[in-house]
Amino acid sequence: KAEIVLDPTMLLTVDEWRQIEKKPKYKVKQKYILVYFLGKLDFYRQDIKEFAIRNDLQIINIFDIDDEKHYCTSPEEFIWLVENAMIIFTDSFHACVFSILFHKSFKVFKRKEIGFEDMFDRVESLLNTFRLQDNIFNGNNIDELNVSDWNYVEDILQILREQSMDFLCNALN
């Protein structure tokens, strides 16, 4: 039987990630949406733009090759941007992880490119584990920012961290 352990990024605490994070060199407005899509953003670009306008938020899209300033964001800066964002819009597993760790509002979008539909299983499993399925964008719920039960998330995270560390320590001995 295969043992399921947490993704390594979840084994570190928020305080440990804060020691790693770094504020970007470029100027960041006080309120912004962090957009991080590994797949094509085209399917959702208009929804996100309209959300930003309605909520008077800057958009920081860190995986847009046309925006060199933000495209060159380092991993340390990425972590800082997640922690300080008003909301995160993403299709990335790890952007979801950091949103969860920092208790941030986020919406996760399914990739629509052919061949990538099944990549969502990992994200869905993560969200189900922490009862965060309502954070999945369903086509018309972009304005529904769910109030997550972060106490529940932290309780489950602590249990899973302990189980994962026990397994890894035993496996390495």
Predicted regions and their residues:
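Active-site anion-handling motifs in enzyme catalytic cores
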Residues: 1-173
